Amino acid sequence: MIKIGILGGEANGSNAIDIIRRIPSFRLVGFYDPDPLRRETLERACRLHSFSNPEMLTGVADAIDIAGPLSHYPSAFRQAIRESKHVFLHNPYTGKASVLRELLKLIGESRGVVQVSQPHRFNPAFLAAFPYVKTPGYMEFQRKIPFRQAGNSQSLVLQYLMHDIDLAMYLTRSNIRKSSVSGVRLVSARPDLVEARLEFENGCVANFMINRVGQEQSHTCHLYQTGMTIRIDLLRQKAEIQHLKNPGPGNVSGTRTSTEQLLVTPSDPLADEMMSFHTSIHNRQSPLVNLEDAFRALEISLDLQERLNWLSVN
């Protein structure tokens, strides 16, 4: 039985409580939130013990789920790492890349598992399509979020686009050679439509588009590689492959295509990644998504956000 505590009572924290309670091998020992009112409300609603400070919670738990931004709990994270506790991070954002580099060095001295939330990697549609991904030459990620759901105070790059960037880097396994970003403000002080482009050293190009002023919600990924295109619907958890066959010279009918619907078993990616965290702890193995992977995606996202900020004021 692994004793686990939660830092942060925001939406991620509330959801984490529900998920962890469904995993019998975890024993939820309590939570901490810096907001006294939210702490009291969540304690009553979830019938869960709340701690008065994060250090006390970290001290009694074997594992910590940091549901809020890492920048809110740096000391608790350092304590957990020094004591070789296991840590699950929902948001690795620390405000500064230098702080994250320091934390990366600390992790090297720890015997604990540190996993970063990347639910898209656990999406059943992505998992069904992944074995067919070889060497994509072009990738296209599109995401539409209803305005009321996204709000207008969040950074589209750091809140949403960063996860798609992680997927692209995971699929290519290549360093980024060049990047660009643009944005348009329609109804908010921040850009409501963002487009980004990454060019990798292996020749692959990834384009990203995110829009938070549409009425409909969608999240898709298209991969183009020799002989096929792969379409992944991350929202509806569907995936298909379009096989392309060149009929050869002299045939005027053009390229022949056939579509294959992949078998996808619907699941909850958030619950699956938490179960993966438990498995990594139990088997003493490296997590699927570690802090080094998250740092690379965060670093490029921060660079894109900085350039987007500059464009917004010029």
Region locations from a protein language model:
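A contiguous active-site-proximal alpha/beta segment in oxidoreductase catalytic domains
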Residues: 94-151
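Short acidic low-complexity segments
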Residues: 48-60
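Mid-domain beta-loop-alpha active-site segment that forms a flexible
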Residues: 117-124, 147-178, 293-294
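C-terminal helix-rich "cap/oligomerization" subdomain common to oxidoreductases
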Residues: 6, 56, 63-66, 201, ...
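Contiguous beta-strand/loop segments that form the cofactor/metal-binding neighborhood of enzyme cores
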Residues: 162-238, 271-283
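N-terminal Rossmann-like dinucleotide-binding module
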Residues: 1-45, 310
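Beta-strand-loop-alpha-helix segment that lines the small-molecule cofactor/substrate pocket
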Residues: 63-70, 74-118
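C-terminal glycine/acidic-rich active-site capping loop/insertion
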Residues: 119, 227-292, 313-314
